[in-house]
């Protein structure tokens, strides 16, 4: 009987450590946050100082979408 209870306890701990039961909850929460978007970023065409100020990129002091395949680049040839 003790062996059976110990085995069940080990299974419960193992499931909680590996995230078996919480994976669906975590994924659904991540999807909701992604759809809502960050609440602290500025939309396109707003003034900015850093890339982190914008939802996309800060180029020339204005939030703009990235036009390069490598992300927010300030190189003239990559931002056209």
Curated annotation (Swiss-Prot):
A Gene Ontology cellular-component term: extracellular region
Modification D-leucine occurs at: 78
Residue positions assigned to the propeptide: 20-35, 80
Disulfide links within the chain: 41-55, 48-58, 54-63, 57-72
Pfam families, per the entry: Toxin_19
Extent of the signal sequence: 1-19
Entry keyword annotation includes Disulfide bond: yes
Predominant subcellular localization, coarse grouping: secreted
InterPro entries (alphabetical): Conotoxin-I_CS (IPR013141), Toxin_19 (IPR012624)
Post-translational modification 4-hydroxyproline, affected residues: 38, 47, 65
Origin: domain of life: Eukaryota
Gene Ontology terms, MF aspect: sodium channel regulator activity; toxin activity
Location in the cell: Secreted
Keywords, in A-Z order: Cleavage on pair of basic residues, D-amino acid, Disulfide bond, Hydroxylation, Ion channel impairing toxin, Neurotoxin, Secreted, Signal, Toxin, Voltage-gated sodium channel impairing toxin
Family recorded in the similarity comment: Belongs to the conotoxin I1 superfamily.
Domain notes: The cysteine framework is XI (C-C-CC-CC-C-C).
Annotated function: Iota-conotoxins bind to voltage-gated sodium channels (Nav) and act as agonists by shifting the voltage-dependence of activation to more hyperpolarized levels. Causes circular motion, convulsions, copious urination, rigid paralysis and death upon intracranial injection into mice. Causes unbalanced swimming, swimming in diagonal and vertical motion and death, when injected intraperitoneally into goldfish. L-Leu and D-Leu forms are active on both nerve and muscle.
Protein's UniProt name: Iota-conotoxin-like r11c
